[in-house]
Each structure stands twice: as C-alpha cells, then as structure tokens.
C-alpha cells in the first residue's frame, strides 16, 4: 500500500482499516513513511473512516448506552477557553455525555487539563467511567487510557512534527461509540469529509461537524460552517444571529486554571463574551442530541439550565463522584 500512496492513489475504507492494523506492527521508519505519504497525497473520507473504525475496534471496550460526545480536533492554534468541556457539562443536565478528551497539544487548555482544573477526577478504568455515568449522566474518557494500541505510533507522530491523519482521528475514535456528536474541525475543507467519515464509522444517528472562522468551534464573532448528518448530509453557514445572540469578541485564555475559572463564572450567571461563546455551542449540542428543536430553542434551554443553577449543581455532582 505504500507504493500506492506514493503514486497518490486513494485507499478504500477496507484498505485504510487494514493499514491502521499494519502500522501497529511496523518499524518506526515505515510508520513515518506511511503517515507522510498519506498526508502528502491528501486524506479522503474513506481513509479517515477506515482509520477511525480500526482505532475504535482496537480501543478498550466500554458500553455506556446511547451517549453524546462534544469534541474537537484541536490544532487551530487558538488560545480560547475550553468550550467543548463547558458544553459537555451543560449537556449532561439533559442527556448522557461521554466526553472523549486528551491533554492539550496546541492550545492552552485541552479538555483533560481543564477538567482537572475544575476539580474533577479523571476515571481510571471503564468501571470508574460507568460509575460516573450512572451517578451524573457524565463520563470523561481520557483518550490515553482507551487507546493502548497507539503506544508505538504516537512517538513517531510526535517526532514528525507535521500534521498527520492522527491529528483529526481523536474525536472520531470515542470508544463509547456515541449516537450523537458535535465535532469541531480546524479547517473548512474537513467539514464534509469528517461528516462522511463519521457516517461510515457507524453508530451515529445525528452529528454536526463545525468550523468557526479559524476555530474548531462555532465562533461568536463571525461566520461558521456546519455539515449536518442525520441520515443525509446538509452543509450551511451560521452566525450568532441564527442563535438569537449578538456578535461578541473571543477573549484569549492563557491556562487551564484560567479556563476553569471563566467556565465557572459563566455557570454562575456572569454575562460576558464567554457566555455567548458557550451558549452558541451548547445550543448546537442540544440540537444535535435532539433535545432542542433548533438553535434558538437550544440557547433558551442552555440559558435556563445556567440561570436555575442546574449546571453548577451538575459540576458539583461530577466533582464528587
């Protein structure tokens, strides 16, 4: 398959699935060659899907029922609060959330970093995650604990210091096999391919793949692109006005501790730019999970959860597991 990639020929879903498993037993040099050849050629939906399905199949198994995930690829280089973590806690007030996350690679506040800064403990085992889900409607699945098969591949990826397919696989490889997912990507071109890949991996009833003017989130200060999947595909653009919100600035964030403090400020009812950023993305997640009928409804549901104290109470439940 390496020669095929060098000739810039695309792999099928089945070939991509096979290649992932081949890489688990290859030398570091050949792993690097495959990853660079694949990236140089350009990734297709079938290749992303084949790798993602193989990554899920090699993951530590966990069954949490019908869950939603809120996760982004990262890699946008932005210094923002961790919106997906805030959204996941709001969402857990209404439905089961399996948040697949990791430590930061390119940002100042990866989801695992912020989760810990919020005073929450990362479940050590699948049984611990199930206990958390049963008690709180929420489980944090720390990626490093669920993908031991990548132990040989990740040092090569890190040493290469260039983008590879693994930069976008994390959100597609949630071992809980989410039924609903809002997934942020770091380039507009990825929206359609990642949505198609999600549909091919299987198990998804509804998903939104979003890109927000340089962010792997919906942006509160401009136009965002969404590719929606619910058995069919639909691509469209939105602005804060579609959510009944004003445009607002994105305030830089310098650390996980700062991100956690600012999330708690919003959960406590503080009205500021962060609130709009979080409400917009929470509304999209509530719509994705079929809790809200549309984005406007999602904003109202999220506002009520914050203003009534439900979200702060949910955070306290998660802290106390």
From Swiss-Prot:
Binding, 5-phospho-alpha-D-ribose 1-diphosphate: 72, 75-76, 80, 82-85, 99-107, 111
Binding-site residues for Mg(2+) 1, renumbered to this chain: 84, 217
Gene Ontology cellular component list: cytosol
Pathway connected to this protein: Amino-acid biosynthesis; L-tryptophan biosynthesis; L-tryptophan from chorismate: step 2/5
Recorded GO MF terms: anthranilate phosphoribosyltransferase activity; magnesium ion binding
Gene3D superfamilies, per database record: Nucleoside phosphorylase/phosphoribosyltransferase catalytic domain, Transferase, Pyrimidine Nucleoside Phosphorylase, Chain C
Cofactor names: Mg(2+)
UniProt binding sites for Mg(2+) 2: 216-217
One Pfam family matching this protein: Glycos_trans_3N
Catalysed reactions listed for this entry: N-(5-phospho-beta-D-ribosyl)anthranilate + diphosphate = 5-phospho-alpha-D-ribose 1-diphosphate + anthranilate
Record-given protein name: Anthranilate phosphoribosyltransferase
Species for this entry: Methanococcus maripaludis (strain DSM 14266 / JCM 13030 / NBRC 101832 / S2 / LL)
Gene this protein is translated from: trpD
């Amino acid at each position: 398959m390496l020669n095929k990639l060098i000739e810039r020929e695309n792999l099928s879903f089945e070939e991509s699935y096979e290649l992932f498993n081949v890489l688990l037993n290859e030398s570091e040099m050949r792993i690097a060659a495959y990853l660079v050849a694949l990236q140089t050629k350009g990734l297709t939906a079938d290749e992303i899907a084949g790798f993602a399905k193989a990554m899920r199949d090699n993951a530590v198994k966990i069954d949490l029922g019908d869950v939603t995930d809120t996760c982004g690829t990262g890699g946008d280089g932005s210094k923002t609060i961790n919106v997906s973590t805030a959204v996941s806690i709001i969402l857990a007030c209404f439905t089961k959330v399996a948040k697949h996350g990791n430590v930061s690679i390119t940002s100042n506040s990866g989801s695992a970093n912020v989760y810990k800064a919020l005073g929450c403990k990362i479940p050590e085992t699948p049984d611990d995650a199930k206990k958390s889900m049963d008690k709180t409607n929420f489980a944090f699945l720390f990626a490093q604990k669920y993908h031991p098969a990548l132990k040989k591949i990740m040092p090569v990826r890190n040493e290469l210091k260039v983008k590879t397919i693994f930069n976008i696989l994390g959100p597609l490889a949630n071992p809980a096999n989410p039924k609903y997912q809002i997934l942020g990507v770091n380039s507009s071109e990825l929206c359609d391919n990642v949505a198609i890949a999600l549909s091919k991996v299987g198990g998804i009833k509804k998903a939104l793949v979003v890109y927000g003017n340089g962010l792997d989130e919906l942006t509160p200060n401009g136009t965002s692109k969404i590719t929606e999947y619910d058995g069919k595909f639909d691509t469209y653009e939105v602005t804060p006005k579609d959510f009944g919100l004003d445009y607002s600035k994105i305030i830089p964030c310098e650390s996980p501790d700062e991100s956690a403090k600012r999330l708690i400020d919003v959960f406590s009812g503080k009205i500021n730019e962060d609130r709009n950023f979080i409400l917009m993305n929470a509304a999209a997640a509530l719509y994705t999970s079929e809790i809200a009928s549309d984005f406007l409804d999602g904003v109202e549901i999220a506002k009520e959860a914050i203003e009534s104290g439900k979200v702060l109470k949910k955070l306290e439940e998660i802290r106390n597991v």
